[in-house]
Regions:
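A composition-driven surface/loop motif
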Residues: 5-395
Length: 395
């Protein structure tokens, strides 16, 4: 314990509420902060066997071969019209080939589960989501071993009354799990890369995500990641859960994986609880600590706080988030932030680690460079174990 205290005394700057100014970009009061949010021990960290199992029966699956402007289908449960392939029944669907200015849609019963296996797929949709999960109970997006897959969308969407909130290259109104060992590149020119309006679970795969005007991996109710390799470059948040209406939702749980995150605003943001048990993280947010709150002369930096593109940070929803300004934190939670393991290298314009409520560190190795606070807890801070080094901070 003494060695941890020594590290803290030598290199840790910790700001608690009332101990330092928050400048003009202070955390705004959010619904999440006023909720009696559950603790980091109480969130649902369960990841089911089906989420982790990327196996499939090729002999019984429906095969969809994309052929440029159309598709051929062998099996039941899917149809094609004018470059739009629609999956309508529960089952496993093997998808291969290229679709130019087309779309893959899931519109099954809300009690049905669908597995989509990508086998060297390229889909580009100029004016809508490349993969639109309109309805289902749950969809498993499996990246077949040894395959390279790409989903892209254009810079503007043509939306109607029934799809006015669609804002991702992958957009799901059902629970979405991404697994397998293949690779997936997601290129978002409009807003976000991957959006689930329910749970978003990732258990494997290699992901290269670019979203200049939006975010990377967004799950409304929660984001759970147990494995995978992620390179994410975004204009807003790289990973986010944003349900502020329910105390047991809006959380992010990560237990493993490698993460190279470059975010215009927050790198990982949870409306309620952010819990990380393991993983390797290389994080840059808001341009990094060089974009600091205080300039070299000791004066407030006039441009500090102008992070991200001039567009909404959160995926389209019914005004669930009440933040009135963006932030550019490394790790951010609305109620509780718990670090229990992992290796972190965080270079942030804003606070490197921030919670409006509590911060608990019981493990992990942290190397922090901050343009504002190193670690900020609005209510309480507990450090029991771990190695923490802050080489730069301004408050």
């Amino acid at each position: 314990m003494k060695k941890y205290l020594a590290v803290l005394i030598a290199s840790l700057l910790i700001i608690l509420a009332g101990c330092g100014p928050e400048n003009g970009t202070a955390e705004q009061t959010t619904k999440a902060a006023s909720l009696n949010a559950i603790s980091a021990d109480e969130i649902d960290t369960t990841v089911g066997k089906s989420d982790q199992d990327a196996a499939y029966d090729e002999s019984s699956a429906t095969k969809i071969t994309l052929t440029g402007a159309s598709a051929s289908i062998s099996g039941n449960g899917a149809s094609q019209k004018d470059g739009v392939v629609t999956i309508q029944q529960e089952g496993t669907y093997l998808v291969s080939g290229t679709l130019e200015n087309g779309q893959l849609v899931v519109d099954a019963a809300d009690t049905e589960k669908v597995q989509i296996v990508l086998q060297n797929v390229s889909i580009d949709c100029s004016d809508h989501a490349a993969l639109f999960i309109k309805q289902a109970d749950k969809v498993f997006l499996t990246l077949a071993e040894g395959t390279e897959n790409t989903l892209s969308s254009g810079s503007s969407y043509a939306l109607g009354d029934d799809d006015s909130n669609v804002d991702g290259v992958i957009f799901s109104r059902a629970d979405l799990t991404m697994n397998g060992s293949g690779s997936l590149a997601v290129n978002a020119a409009y807003k976000h890369a991957v959006v689930s309006k329910d749970d978003l679970v990732v258990t494997g795969g290699q992901y290269a995500i670019k979203a200049e005007n939006g975010g990377g991996l967004y799950g409304k109710d929660c984001v759970k990641i147990t494995g995978g390799a992620f390179t994410i470059a975004t204009g807003t948040d790289a990973i986010q859960a944003n349900n502020a209406e329910k105390a047991d939702q809006g959380y992010v749980y990560i237990s493993g994986g490698t993460f190279d995150l470059t975010a215009g605003t927050d790198a990982v943001q949870a409306e309620t609880v952010l819990r990380i048990d393991g993983g390797t993280f290389q994080i840059t947010s808001g341009g990094g600590s060089a974009n600091a709150s205080i300039d070299k002369s000791g004066k407030d930096s006039p441009g500090w706080g102008m992070w991200g593109p001039q567009s909404e940070q959160n995926p389209s929803q019914d005004a669930e988030s009440t933040d009135t300004s963006d932030s550019a934190k490394g790790l951010k939670a609305g109620a509780s932030l718990s670090l229990r393991g992992g290796t972190f290298s965080i270079n942030s314009s804003d606070d490197s680690i921030h919670s409006n409520g509590t911060v608990t560190i019981t493990g992990g190795t942290l190397s922090l460079k901050s343009g504002d606070d190193g670690v900020h807890a609005g209510d309480a801070l507990l450090i029991e174990e771990g190695t923490i080094k802050i080489s730069q901070s301004y408050e």
